[in-house]
Amino acid sequence: MTRSSDTPSSSRASLSYKDAGVDIDAGNALVERIKGVAKRTSRPEVMGGLGGFGALCQLPTGYREPVLVSGTDGVGTKLRLAMDLARHDTIGIDLVAMCVNDLVVAGAEPLFFLDYYATGKLDVDIAADVVTGIGEGCAQAGCALIGGETAEMPGMYAGSDYDLAGFCVGVVEKSEILDGSRVAEGDVLLGLASSGPHSNGYSLIRKIIERGQADLEQEIDGIPLRDALLAPTRIYVKSLLSLIKESDVTVHALSHITGGGLLENVPRVLPDTLAARIDAASWTRPAVFDWLQREGNVDEHEMHRVLNCGIGMVVVVPAAQAERAQAALEAAGETVHRLGEIVPRQDEEEQVRLENVR
């Protein structure tokens, strides 16, 4: 009888999952390494620790009509730059920031965060550095790291290259949701300074570096260019929640300045009948953006359409409360610029009038 090709044979070596490229022991070792990270971010509402099939979290007390707010995001190709420069310790902060800064725009308090880490070959040290950064981001935002997924997928990624995604859930009182409906003519726009490009525009940034063979050790405004480009995204959650919940300022809207810059993100929180008049001379653009524009010969409009240009969050408040809002935000550690005001929109004009551009 002829043996079929799929019949087991004692002459063949016994295969294991590790032979196929998946190291279960490495995954278990990572879980043990990061348990302390998760524990340090815990909130009273969290039930249980890492390792369960699902993570449990109660709603906080004190809400009459709690509304859950969710968000998911990644860090784009900033991740590629971080891997190329072997800087894995802060990219997790970026991941958290991109999610929680979106949640706080609705007025929501972030409750918990989960991450997804996918790689071709799990390097426990690299993964632990990344998750430690995620824990730091959660601590800055006041939310709990309650779970995640580590996927080792040989053949899907080159070597120890990895990809990241984050998922966050927050809560807001139904009557206090910020949705832009309160924005009115005469409101003032306050801009909160960014820490750098944050996590957007990195395909353009990497192209500029590649084309010019840039020396990433050169100093820009007193720090190496590599550090300026990889500065973690600023997390605005605590300062904004303090303004919303603990001050006498009525916040009308918030806008997280991500991909699309001021030109595309501010309109997302404006009624169709209103526009934002922003004075581009009201803040000094950080040196890293000037370097990018010069080295890439990037058009001014493109700069404001792709990069945050030094403004990471916009706060819209009544004109009579603008000074109090600015003082409160500065007391919370933010650098604040008075960008402009809300004006009537003329016909179908663009909703951001950027004046005094270079």
Curated annotation (Swiss-Prot):
Top EC class, one word: ligase
* Cellular component, GO annotation: cytosol
Give the enzyme's EC designation.
Answer: 6.3.3.1
- Predominant subcellular localization, coarse grouping: cytoplasm
Q: Where in the cell is it found?
A: Cytoplasm
This protein's record includes keyword Ligase: yes
**What is this protein identified as?**
Phosphoribosylformylglycinamidine cyclo-ligase
Q: Which organism is it from?
A: Chromohalobacter salexigens (strain ATCC BAA-138 / DSM 3043 / CIP 106854 / NCIMB 13768 / 1H11)
Q: Where is the organism placed in the taxonomic lineage, from the top? A: Bacteria, Pseudomonadati, Pseudomonadota, Gammaproteobacteria, Oceanospirillales
